[in-house]
Amino acid sequence: MLFLGLAWLVLAACIAAGCFTPAHRLPTWLPNDKLLHFGAYFALAFPMAFVTQSWSRLLLIAIGLSIAGFLIEIVQRYIPGRDFSIADMVANTGGVVMGIGAGYMCLALHQALPDSLGTLL
């Protein structure tokens, strides 16, 4: 569990670094901005289903990650070459919802497998 927590913090720090970098310093080869937002928040949310199976806690985590995305968008308004984007917030929240949903489905599938199959995966 400690490794998962540390990996999550490193991922969050990398995402934050990308979010707070002025536009002229970002690589030009990056794919679609909205896909990056969706993927980043999906990656942050996915492991949360393995940390807690409580729907109320997952809802709080989803709200917290979505609020973090909103606050980052506000800060980006003051970073050279970056701007506030509602479409980015939608992509962030979509990534959170799909990440938690996919994580929960993977966990449920793993728990539903017979023990003999579960050891193979």
Pin down the residues of each PLM region.
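Bulky hydrophobic segments
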Residues: 1-89, 93, 97-121
